[in-house]
Each structure stands twice: as C-alpha cells, then as structure tokens.
Amino acid sequence: MATIFSRIIAGEIPCYKVADNEKFFAFLDINPLVKGHTLVVPKQEVDYIFDLSDEDLAAMHVFAKKVALAVGKAFPCKKVGEAVLGLEVPHAHIHLIPMQNEKDMFFSNPKLKLTDEEFKAVAEAIRAAF
C-alpha cells in the first residue's frame, strides 16, 4: 500500500508543493512548527533514509539544500534546521525548519494552524525565492 507521501507525490492527496525534480519532492508540512516548515521526500518509496543508495542520499541532500536556501530567503531566520525523524510516516523525509533559536526545532511544540490561503502564500513565497 502506498504511503501518504507517495499519494501526495502522485497527486491523489493535495499538498502545498514547493519544488520537485525527477527524484525528489518538497512540500509544506501540514502541521508546521513555524511558517516555512517544509518536507523533502524521495519519489522512490523508501522507509528508512539510510536505505537510499549513496548516490540518492547525496542527491537528496543537495536538493534539500536548494529548498532550504529558498526557505531561508522567504522566511528570514538565523538558520534553516534539518531533522530526520521518520517514525510517523514510513517514507524517508527531511524536515526543513526556519529557526530563530533551537526551540523552533522542538517537535513537542504546539503546531501552527494555518488557513488554506496562508499555506498557499507560504508555498508561493518559497517558490518565488528559488
């Protein structure tokens, strides 16, 4: 059975897409810690990020870097943090989170509740920053 991320990539479930290429897909986290919280996933369905080939793992991080630079331009911050957890969804993914301080990376923090229009504006701001 396809993961929720595979269904998002296939267009079966809507998302706020930020970027993609032939191997990777970036979209806004639907339960963001802060505005600009973005997920980067491989289009190949792989549960554990370290099960990716060395080539694909490196390419995923290069793609994530491009997305992170756009996130940082769209949402000025001290740094864009990167986290790999992967326990909730069995599909490898990288969280990119604009940070003013390390507390912005605490996944136990309350999640933002954004409207559809706010999500669209966030995604557009990141896309425009590429």
Task: Show where each model-derived region lies.
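HIT superfamily nucleotide-processing domains
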Residues: 1-130
